Amino acid sequence: MTGLRSDMITKGIDRAPHRSLLRAAGVKEEDFGKPFIAVCNSYIDIVPGHVHLQEFGKIVKEAIREAGGVPFEFNTIGVDDGIAMGHIGMRYSLPSREIIADSVETVVSAHWFDGMVCIPNCDKITPGMIMAAMRINIPTVFVSGGPMEAGRTSDGRKISLSSVFEGVGAYQSGKIDEKGLEELEQFGCPTCGSCSGMFTANSMNCLSEALGIAMPGNGTILATSPDRREFAKQSARQLMELIKSDIKPRDIVTEKAIDNAFALDMALGGSTNTILHTLAIANEAGVDYSLERINEVAARVPHLSKLAPASDVFIEDLHEAGGVSAVLNELSKKEGALHLDTLTVTGKTLGENIAGREVKDYEVIHPIDQPFSEQGGLAVLFGNLAPDGAIIKTGGVQDGITRHEGPAVVFDSQEEALDGIINRKVKAGDVVIIRYEGPKGGPGMPEMLAPTSQIVGMGLGPKVALITDGRFSGASRGLSIGHVSPEAAEGGPLAFVENGDHIVVDIEKRILNIEISDEEWEKRKANWPGFEPKVKTGYLARYSKLVTSANTGGIMKI
């Protein structure tokens, strides 16, 4: 093979020192002239979604060698959002996405690889690697580690990590005893893999199929299944074909491909975090994609599958029902729902990939003419409380609830809110405001899983709305509205809300408003003392200065 990118470090007299170093790293004489492939892994012992990825790296490298490439493996960092939840660790979660993107870009660009296999799985690792792939723009395929099996209680009921979080609230409100909580803890996470519901990790890994950067099966084949190992081999072999065809990420990730990703998101009722990450990916791909366009996708795409935490249906059930390809095939029956001509890493179009992939269980994936709702499972709200938008997972809201209005109960941090909820300062009908938790204010835009789980666990899920400039775990459900932009730390409207203010949430009309006179509003703005950064040293201080609000993906800009 000639004209390789890696020729930069392997060809010519002046590259003798480079070749000498490569020989020391194990490169043989016959390897020079073959494609050099970066195997970007994310194996880490403390993250259950990644503990098995060392094996995956070996499988991928062997498949690359067999297909005529020379693999070089390296690892990224990773943060487990569940373990980081509820303390300062969560402030590092979203910022870790930027570190991952920067580190992958650095390693691959410095060493002139010809192609890349990315092996992510959990929340920020997948989007971080995709962002890097858009920047580098060399042939790349994604192979996630696969979802965890659902847990099962002693009576056979399926559960997940969100069941454990909500179990804490149920225990504290006296709904279950300590033995009941212990059972949830013991069985909530039974295997390796990304947590078993339609949470952020599984949402992003499913969206990778619709986006076109991963082969069919990426989002739903279980981590423990032998099929996942075979999938890794096939994906590695396919990368070598992408190099021959010179198909690059930016050839695949276009505006229409992003429409398809959001269409799947709407059909599945995915995590709200997918919007944050996909907007960041669009930015790196050079695609100008607005929040308003997401509502346009939602308007034409029905909600076909309701998965945990919104139901007792899990990713393993979605896989058995036909997986992502079956969902997309069902969507394709509605004119205009998908762009079937978009290119994918298979070398075929999305339409060709999903042809004939029929639904096997219409209880799990509803027919196109019998959806859970005519509009998708995510929505963007606008109003005087969110001029630049806010996100709600409509698929996670209890059936029949489309509007909520009530008095604001204001907290200036997640910790303050959690304490207030536990101590019964929040009652039915209230609108909880948690502010100064955005990308800049948090810093790091921490997830609000603990407060939402506490609210649900106490039986207030359908009766209380929660609004924040922070974000939510994919395991969150209920009237949870996040990503409010501009954030409070930037002088956004949330900064001026006071206890007792009347807040209106109207999902059908896509409205998020505060009812207050212009005169009073201007008075509050004039008296706002400004925001004092919570962290003044280290990475989070730097991140806080450079990061944008959620409506642009929470990206870092100079």
Curated annotation (Swiss-Prot):
GO biological-process terms attached to the record: isoleucine biosynthetic process; L-valine biosynthetic process
Cofactors named for this entry: [2Fe-2S] cluster; Mg(2+)
Entry EC number(s): 4.2.1.9
Cellular component terms per the entry's GO annotation: cytosol
Cofactor binding note from Swiss-Prot or TrEMBL: Binds 1 [2Fe-2S] cluster per subunit. This cluster acts as a Lewis acid cofactor.
Domain of life: Bacteria
Active site: 473 (proton acceptor)
Coiled coil (UniProt feature): none
Residues given in the record as [2Fe-2S] cluster binding sites: 122, 195
Positions bound to Mg(2+): 81, 123-124, 447
GO MF annotation list: 2 iron, 2 sulfur cluster binding; dihydroxy-acid dehydratase activity; magnesium ion binding
InterPro entries: Dihydro-acid_dehy_C (IPR042096), DihydroxyA_deHydtase (IPR004404), DiOHA_6PGluconate_deHydtase_CS (IPR020558), ILV_EDD_C (IPR056740), ILV_EDD_N (IPR000581), IlvD/EDD_N (IPR037237)
Keywords: 2Fe-2S, Amino-acid biosynthesis, Branched-chain amino acid biosynthesis, Iron, Iron-sulfur, Lyase, Magnesium, Metal-binding
Residue numbers carrying N6-carboxylysine: 124
Family of the protein in this entry: Belongs to the IlvD/Edd family.
Function as written in the Swiss-Prot or TrEMBL entry: Functions in the biosynthesis of branched-chain amino acids. Catalyzes the dehydration of (2R,3R)-2,3-dihydroxy-3-methylpentanoate (2,3-dihydroxy-3-methylvalerate) into 2-oxo-3-methylpentanoate (2-oxo-3-methylvalerate) and of (2R)-2,3-dihydroxy-3-methylbutanoate (2,3-dihydroxyisovalerate) into 2-oxo-3-methylbutanoate (2-oxoisovalerate), the penultimate precursor to L-isoleucine and L-valine, respectively.
Annotated NCBIfam families: ilvD, PRK00911.1
Quaternary organization: Homodimer.
Protein name as annotated: Dihydroxy-acid dehydratase
Naturally occurring in which organism (per UniProt): Bacillus licheniformis (strain ATCC 14580 / DSM 13 / JCM 2505 / CCUG 7422 / NBRC 12200 / NCIMB 9375 / NCTC 10341 / NRRL NRS-1264 / Gibson 46)
